[in-house]
Amino acid sequence: MYEAVYAHPDGDSTVARHALTAADSEYDGIVVRNHGDEQADYDADAISDAYGVDVAAGIEVRADDPSRASGFVGNYRSDRTVVVVHGGDRRINRFAVEQPTVDVLAHPMRDDGDFNHVLANAAADNGVRVEFDFGPVLRASGGSRVRAIKELRKLRELVENAGAPFVVSASPSTHLQIRAPRDIIAVGETIGFDADTVREGLTEWGQIVERNRERQSGAVIEPGVRLEDDADDAE
């Protein structure tokens, strides 16, 4: 299972500190999902070797309109393992779920964002994961927490009905906000998610990383078609 983190300068903790806490929390890896204007400077391989967790380079595209978002996605797709689109705007939500090159639509219900069955079906058709962001449930209180729970339940129902793919995250911006998978699963169960759904959502980040690394390596010509090494042919 993986967690997707915001590291310094987009958060308060370095990538290395996030990785250490993730390892202690029994994650297999982290995705560094900083926004494009606040990217982190880090050596993923060195950190991975030091702490025994995978460190995947991601990006969270944040834009005011779909045309700019499209340009950013195109710019980052070839060199980032995970491409996330910062949701919460109705136009951006729609753009993201209609783009097969987008891996994840993040927090689509945030701010004045909305998500409906049409967008859920588009996400299913294009293989775009919808994020269940548990961060507000873990960190908000009072009316804000109640609203966050209500929005997550609505989002879960839409995603389930459409059969759309999804990820789960606590969206930590500091290592102190990282919660162990068992804790996130427990929180999910208290707000109406079953344990298997939360576990699947945490695992899906790693599936994205594995699939995209394979594609970037050139081993995949098109979905379902792989290049085999000469060594394999010789066996």
From Swiss-Prot:
Q: Does the keyword Glycoprotein apply?
A: no
Q: Where in the cell is it found?
A: Cytoplasm
The record, for InterPro entries, names: Pol/histidinol_Pase-like, RNase_P_comp-3_arc, RNase_P_p30
- Molecular function terms, GO-annotated: ribonuclease P activity
- E.C. no: 3.1.26.5
One protein family per Pfam: RNase_P_p30
Which transformation does this protein catalyse, written as a reaction? Endonucleolytic cleavage of RNA, removing 5'-extranucleotides from tRNA precursor
Task: Output the superkingdom of the source species.
Answer: Archaea
Q: Name one GO cellular component term.
A: cytoplasm
- By its UniProt entry, which SUPFAM superfamilies does this protein fall under? PHP domain-like (SSF89550)
Q: Which UniProt keywords apply?
A: Cytoplasm, Endonuclease, Hydrolase, Nuclease, tRNA processing
Q: How is the quaternary structure described?
A: Consists of a catalytic RNA component and at least 4-5 protein subunits.
> Into which family does the record put it?
Belongs to the eukaryotic/archaeal RNase P protein component 3 family.
Task: Name the job this protein performs.
Answer: Part of ribonuclease P, a protein complex that generates mature tRNA molecules by cleaving their 5'-ends.
Its protein name is Ribonuclease P protein component 3
